[in-house]
């Protein structure tokens, strides 16, 4: 959320508008994400992949590989952290994700074996793809647009935290469209207000 106080965002539009851009981006993003049922679709994909790859029900290798891959990939932090890294905003979110994934993988590997370690391959490819998207966005977006996108990402991180701590169950993946909408709303506020 420190991006909210970024001077490029604060100076790009009239006083009070940066928070409106962030809130409106989250609102419209949540509406789009809920309409598209992003969270439900990700869960459905995970369940289908898991059942199709583990037909015999006896292979802990496949169970470990699929379960770990899905848990480490299906989540907003994998996308948000990789995009932030690609845009040059730092790797702090990826470090947080890696730490959480590391502890989770220890628990999984104890019961499911070496398949958990091999899940790092699809996770690496997935995160690299999102980092490439971030590299592209970082080259075409203005600083204030990146700050708006990062501020929205900070709100998503709060949602992820509440979910992980079991304080509030939120469909954070449904808020992912807000990341794409925030730079557009920031541009509109910058040019027309």
Language model: regions and residue ranges:
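Hydrophobic transmembrane alpha-helices of secondary-active transporters
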Residues: 1-11, 32, 103-109, 151-165
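Interfacial loop-to-helix junctions that mark the boundaries of transmembrane helices
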Residues: 8-21, 87-93, 140-149, 170
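Helix-loop-helix junctions within the multi-pass membrane cores of secondary transporters/permeases
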Residues: 60-136
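Alpha-helical transmembrane segments of helical membrane proteins, especially in multi-pass transport
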Residues: 116-158, 163
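Interfacial loop-to-transmembrane junctions
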Residues: 162-181
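Juxtamembrane boundary at the C-terminal end of a transmembrane helix
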Residues: 183-193
């Amino acid at each position: 959320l420190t991006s909210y106080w970024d001077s490029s965002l604060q100076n790009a539009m009239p006083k009070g508008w940066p928070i409106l851009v962030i809130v409106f981006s989250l609102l419209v993003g949540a509406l789009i994400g809920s309409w598209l049922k992003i969270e439900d679709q990700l869960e459905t994909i995970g369940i289908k992949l898991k059942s199709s790859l583990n037909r015999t029900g006896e292979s802990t290798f496949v169970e470990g590989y699929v379960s770990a891959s899905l848990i480490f990939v299906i989540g907003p932090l994998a996308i948000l952290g990789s995009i932030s890294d690609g845009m040059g905003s730092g790797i702090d979110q990826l470090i947080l994700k890696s730490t959480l994934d590391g502890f989770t993988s220890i628990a999984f590997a104890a019961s499911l074996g070496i398949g958990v370690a091999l899940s790092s391959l699809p996770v690496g490819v997935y995160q690299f793809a999102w980092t490439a998207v971030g590299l592209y966005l970082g080259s075409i977006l203005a600083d204030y647009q990146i700050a708006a996108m990062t501020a929205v990402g900070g709100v998503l991180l709060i949602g992820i935290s509440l979910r992980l701590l079991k304080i509030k169950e939120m469909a954070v993946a449904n808020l992912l469209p807000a990341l794409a909408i925030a730079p557009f709303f920031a541009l509109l506020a910058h040019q027309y207000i």
